[in-house]
Amino acid sequence: MSLEVVARHFDALGSTCELQVVAGSQAALERCEQQVRLAEARFTRFVRDSELSQLNASHGRYTPVSPQMFSMLEAAVWAYQESGGLVNAAVLPALMAAGYDRPFIEGLSQPASVVAVQPAPLVEVLALDRPTRSAAVAPGVALDLGGIAKGFLADQLIDELGDNAVCNLGGDLRLRGGGPEGDGWHIGLCDRSAVALTDGGVATSGVTRRRWGQGMHHLIDPRTGLPARTDLLEVSVVTDCALRGEVYAKCAVLLGAVGGAAFLEARGVHYAMLPAEASRAA
């Protein structure tokens, strides 16, 4: 017998989000949605007085930050190191140069000229001081946390949702429990296959969701400072948490089908790829 699933859908973080809980309450889901919205207000680069914007404007001075921001910045450093520099939060100037200078929903336009802006190595331009819970961003550098925010938050919120739940933030999700049928939550991957999981994370990254102009998209290759040129449209990764999946999926897209497969297989994770030729054959 299937158990009742309580669900809540909402738009946040530039994406569609879905929370599902077996035998849960709408009140609990509403509280989690509110936490997502508060985090979005903290991490956005599109609001001048957000915590991230203030940090970006600190001109190299150490600035006290909230506990959640400090944890997010630590996650950004981990992502940079784990990815060998492919996931680099110091990518904001490159995004701006590519035309991603406002929320995507407001419409983006092709820049008059596309200028490559290679991001500085994050570990050289972001300093963290744990005793004072403060951070410093080097002058001339600006961070964008959108590349890891959804996975980071999904991992945080799963504890709020309980022992049988899914937190899906724009395709980056964390889950636990047997689902309504008891055999795990059934999660679709980018190649239309599916997996049944009772604990872990699934994340999908690609170049199909935020596109504008001619060949412009939001996934910057830090090796070139330009929107990535890749033979993959999307990659889904199944691993122990949403943040790791998000980082690994981005790496695979940036590395392309051959390099991405080698990267993921070396880490022993399940994955699915959607090659660019799949769109032409459809």
Task: Name the predicted role of every residue range.
Residues M1-A282:
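Mature catalytic core of soluble alpha/beta enzymes
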